[in-house]
């Protein structure tokens, strides 16, 4: 189930994004990005609709994933 990020408290959203960034360990290429830059990049992607917040009822977890992947059914078991 997609969770509307706009309805979350800003501090809660920041914590969710930070947790995701730290958990994912995303590679940003040759130049290393700070945590703040990575968080801002994910926030930008949420605002543009590139990624969505997804709640898994099965696992009772929240994840951030590309909208295309969610729409294609790649969200299972989310």
UniProtKB/Swiss-Prot annotation:
Gene3D superfamilies: YehU-like. Pfam families: UPF0270 (PF06794). It comes from the Bacteria. Belongs to the UPF0270 family. This is UPF0270 protein PC1_3850.
């Amino acid at each position: 189930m997609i969770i509307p990020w706009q309805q979350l408290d800003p501090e809660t959203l920041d914590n969710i994004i930070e947790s995701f960034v730290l958990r994912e360990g995303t590679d940003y290429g040759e130049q290393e990005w700070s945590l703040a830059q990575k968080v801002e990049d994910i926030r930008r992607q949420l605002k543009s609709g590139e990624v969505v917040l997804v709640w898994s009822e099965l696992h009772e977890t929240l994840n951030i994933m590309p909208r295309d992947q969610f729409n294609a059914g790649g969200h299972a078991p989310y």
